[in-house]
Each structure stands twice: as structure tokens, then as C-alpha cells.
Amino acid sequence: MATDIKQLVKEVLNRGYLMSLATSDNGGVWVCDVIYIHDDDLNIYWMSDPDVRHSQAIIANNKVAGTITISGPGESNLGIQFEGTAEKIEGNRYDLALKHYAKRKKSAPKENDDVLGGDSWYILKPKKVELINEKLYGFDKRRIEL
């Protein structure tokens, strides 16, 4: 069953566009939306300015949580909730840029383009994921631990 749930989680990641990312710092909790991409291990990547609050919070406290919701009004609820750790990734990461540009329906950058423009890449490594798929399971969440 865990394999099936992991595949359903991947489907949500494939269909989604924005992730709501929750962080915490000395000022309290904070949430922001970021455009994300993912890999086959369910790791989630995004670009952000390293000086914004959520990026600074990750440096101070790498424990994060998030949600990705696919459904809209009148549709069955579909999405994921997760917790894990996040960190900044060094480098231009052209491989990530290609996926990110494709997701945003932009032309592929050239390998030597400055795709970050002052931003940095970040990775979220989920530890627990809860799937909400009302069509298949009602409101009985399915969970996987990674």
C-alpha cells in the first residue's frame, strides 16, 4: 500500500504548482507560497531570495512543513501535507533550472545563463507526508514516512 500512496503523492506533486511553506524563527511562525519542482524521491526544490524571511528562517531552524492543494471549489479535496527539513543548495543547478522553467512554461535557459538572478536553490526533504484524496479515501488521510 505504501508504494501506491507514494505514487499518489507523486501525482499531486506533478499536478501542483504552488507550495505553501511554513517556517519558524525568533519572530514566530511564517508561511509563504513558492513555485516548486520535485524529484523521484519526493524531495521538493524552489528558488528564493536568500534575504527573505522564510529563507533566513531555514538557516536558523531547518524544520519546516508545507501543503500542496490541487482541488478547487466544487471538486473533491486532493492534496498533501508534510513535514521535514530544508536547506539552501549552493550552485546554479542547471538541471533544476530546466525543470523549473518548464513548469513555469518558460523557454529553457542556456546552460551559462544566470537563472538565479540573486536567488538561491532550496531543498525540502520530507520526513512524513499525509495524502488527502477525498475521491479515494474520503477524509481518511493516508500517511507515509520517508
What does each of the following model-derived ranges do?
Residues 1-18:
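Extreme N-terminal tail/first-helix region
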Residues 13-14, 59, 102:
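Alpha-helix boundary recognition
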Residues 14, 28-29, 114-117:
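Short solvent-exposed loop/turn micro-motifs enriched in small/polar/acidic residues
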Residues 16-50, 58, 64-69, 78-81:
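Short beta-strand segments
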Residues 23-25, 69-71, 108-116:
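A short, aromatic/hydrophobic, helix- or strand-capping loop or linear motif
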Residues 49-53, 102:
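Short, solvent-exposed aromatic-acidic interface loops
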Residues 52-54, 73, 137-139:
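Short, surface-exposed beta-strand-loop junctions and turns on beta-sheet-rich folds
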